[in-house]
């Protein structure tokens, strides 16, 4: 803390937010301007010795060639020279004149803020507002955008109408951080981006002020792990008094004037102590009595509030080797929180904006305890040390001061309370200067305040010239509220009675923690392909509403630049395909990868490569990331905070361990948010759909909720709320739901667009053809669709098409027969839910559920709701409450609560909802339950099997028709929802669909590069588009591309050799050089798979194409095949390239980064059941191991011998 004033308040704030934040300007040069004279070394410093040769690593000497002159700034220690161009942006003159330097004044009158009877002229306010708004939009890289211009117009209109304007919350956050960044007297500014801003502009009374302040202290103290924070109360308004905090700091020790003129306690606080006594405080008589707060609402007298003792963390001081030191009875408080300075942002003034950081040890050890006008313990300590105090040449003052500072550091570290020594603080400031020179071209700094009170030239800042000037936003000193024109409403008429004081203390205790819950905003982002992540995010939103102000957004609805101003973000996301983001998360992913701070805090510069590839390659186990994390932890308070310095975050990933890159996108988002400076509140959660995903999410959500309310101090009863949300005894409440008749019926295509939130169009069937032999027991079909040349259905070979199928009519009718009290068959309905009212708020009301469009119950079950997937444990819990037979109720409860039993039941039976109802016939089935609790029927994705150049206006699909029996082949027959529907279509039938691009699975632009294509079964689908496109290039464009190699696999040459004639024709026309086929069930032949072909016949070619000719390899098929092919290729590269297996793995990683090893992986098939069972067993063992001693949602990543990454 800065300690330069002997009477009245102490002017300076903490190290975490600066050594003083004062604004006295260096008078050697007058106000900072383009014409300022070059700065010189401090006048009282000794003449510098000849500087050493400049360090070649220092910034080069770069004076702007033309235009105005800028201050020349030299570092006398290393000889480096820079020019402060930022000083040209200063709009305010300093206090100095050409004949007088006032730079050493603590409170230059010219720079103190005083309440004015007349508001600032609109032109002046508008000028400052425009400058600030431009700063803000430049910071988010939107300068000159339509949003920027629109915001300027809004501010101008508001000023014209009201004479002032209001900041948006994001602008307030930015402005508060910039004010800290611009504070010339602050040595700890490297952490400016980590300032937590609490918006208290809705405060209306002194009691509410106290509530905010208590929560500020609790949050910032954080049990000794201090966090920088600011609470901003309402701005100054014309014709109204100010909100003011009379105390100079939120925590201060009283100073009692004695009859002999001496002071017991802190002499700096005598005046505020006497004011507190006048307002009814009953003082103690100790040296370290914590003062109450005097808080003033506009035009009201100040009110007295005593801080609850449990809120103020204090540190008893002891010495590591001098045992007698503890007997001195010294102590100091942990949290330095300046409360009497004014915050100015864009011309708006906030007279009450307390801010806090952490101490630099010399603020306590040298200034507070040793200054003659403070506690003045220097000589007492020197005597105890047996030092000669009779002569200054014994340096007794210096020796005693060092030991006192050592005691302070030792005591705070022993108590685990954040503190920084002056050497570390000044070294971090030098790094901050370097950062700011690169980012802004300069940094305002007051040399007299930056250099610490001891060690002078032993610190690097002593040798650094500095330029002092005023930038906006800024912190400013202001006159005491009980003096002069600021004293309106401050008169003291009487002392408060004991009862009134007791009531004030009672209010102090009761108000703590009651407001923050409504004020801390939480943003919940989801990325989802199937809707499950969205459902989980909505559950999370309901949970966080118990203690926060949450909003739930899809990633594609969220502006990523808002992350810099967020307080708490929770991410729930799935991973699509080959480790990619879900489609509605792609824009978020790209923007997140492009984000950087003022100084990029990433562990390494980003290379120019696909963000999808980057997401697949980032992991928490990355050694570079681990090294960066370790370094960041060691220098938490002395290093740059990063772009997301104030963000706290938690991430949960959904996935399946059957797929490579399990939860890859979630892991990458988790790592990237930390790289950008965010603080992880909870380790990454992962939910495996093969084993206990719902339980994993429930456990993670409760843990995330607890970590969040502990971090933001929003109330101790939040844990009970979490248990209520995820309680296994939740019941279906019929009275909370109803169906309402709707006038308008369903239009299918707009309805699908509403449900899936994506653009969708309708294609028409041209033909459906079975590609397998009539002797085959299975079917694979070629579906030809007419696109009508619609722009929305334009595609490239390798892309995917999404199809929205209906459920089978027979299944729908059987389910309808089980619904109790259904609505009339042809009547469109909507579900309405009874929203609870709140005390003082709106009464209970019926609100329509927006998930589905108005439609009949039959239409909902046919087109929008998933009735074939096994019901989730949550749905089974609800069904158990609707069962009339107690035995069925108990069985359903057991299934819903025992994860292992549920997974075994689901895996063996794979039951549809109808089969569950047949197994538990006493369950009643309300229509609203179906419409609100069933998951959405998701689109099915297929690789496009054609090229637009070969078949204009058409899209072809290659689809395996799925039919199988559950229960080891003895259960009911199940059909693939989409494949069965497609197989039954006739020419002219409509097909709702959309295109999903796959830019990472396309032939290289250079046709001369060799390519190897590997695709068994329907994995050949995208390659048909490849060869059709190449044929078109050969015959229409005259190109001569390099012949490709195709490796295909099927069961039997006479049954399911798909597209054999087409492939042979393409080979004869020069598209393929080699075509090899693996038969797994060919009579009188051994089983052969595509990976066997690669190993036995193509090993040399694989190595040559990938390592020597910069060629490409494409793999398409199910997850088991793709993993086996990958392992085979790795072994081939190791053998043919004479390298270790790990080295070959690194080569494949490079190939993926270069987008030369491509994978198009689709879901589980019947053939993968054995492998999937093994993965489920591994998942169960992981879960059980964690249940014995850890948490089920933080599953370990699979080992190198498992199918997962």
From Swiss-Prot:
Residues 1-73, 819-850 are annotated as: Disordered. It catalyses: 2 L-arginine + 3 NADPH + 4 O2 + H(+) = 2 L-citrulline + 2 nitric oxide + 3 NADP(+) + 4 H2O. A lipid is attached at residue 2 (N-myristoyl glycine). Residues 15-27 have a biased composition (Gly residues). Zn(2+) binds at residues 96, 101. The modification Phosphothreonine is found at residues 497, 1177. A lipid is attached at residues 15, 26 (S-palmitoyl cysteine). FMN binds at residues 528-530, 532, 574-575, 656, 663, 689, 693. NADP(+) binds at residues 778, 1018, 1051, 1080-1081, 1087, 1089, 1091. InterPro entries: CysJ-like_FAD-binding, FAD-bd_FR_type, Flavdoxin-like, Flavodoxin/NO_synth, Flavoprot_Pyr_Nucl_cyt_Rdtase, Flavoprotein-like_sf, FNR_nucleotide-bd, NADPH_Cyt_P450_Rdtase_alpha. FAD binds at residues 800, 940, 942-943, 958, 960, 964, 977-979. Residues 100-488 are annotated as: Interaction with NOSIP. L-arginine binds at residues 249, 358-359, 363, 368. Heme b binds at residues 186, 477. Its main location: membrane. It is found in: Membrane, Caveola; Cytoplasm, Cytoskeleton; Golgi apparatus; Cell membrane. The modification Phosphoserine is found at residues 116, 617, 635, 640, 838, 1179, 1181. (6R)-L-erythro-5,6,7,8-tetrahydrobiopterin binds at residues 104, 448-449, 462. It is an enzyme of class 1 (oxidoreductase). Binds 1 FAD. Binds 1 FMN. Its EC number is 1.14.13.39. Its cofactor is heme b; FAD; FMN; (6R)-L-erythro-5,6,7,8-tetrahydrobiopterin. Produces nitric oxide (NO) which is implicated in vascular smooth muscle relaxation through a cGMP-mediated signal transduction pathway. NO mediates vascular endothelial growth factor (VEGF)-induced angiogenesis in coronary vessels and promotes blood clotting through the activation of platelets. Homodimer. Interacts with NOSIP and NOSTRIN. Interacts with HSP90AB1. Forms a complex with ASL, ASS1 and SLC7A1; the complex regulates cell-autonomous L-arginine synthesis and citrulline recycling while channeling extracellular L-arginine to nitric oxide synthesis pathway. Belongs to the NOS family. This is Nitric oxide synthase 3. It comes from Canis lupus familiaris (Dog).
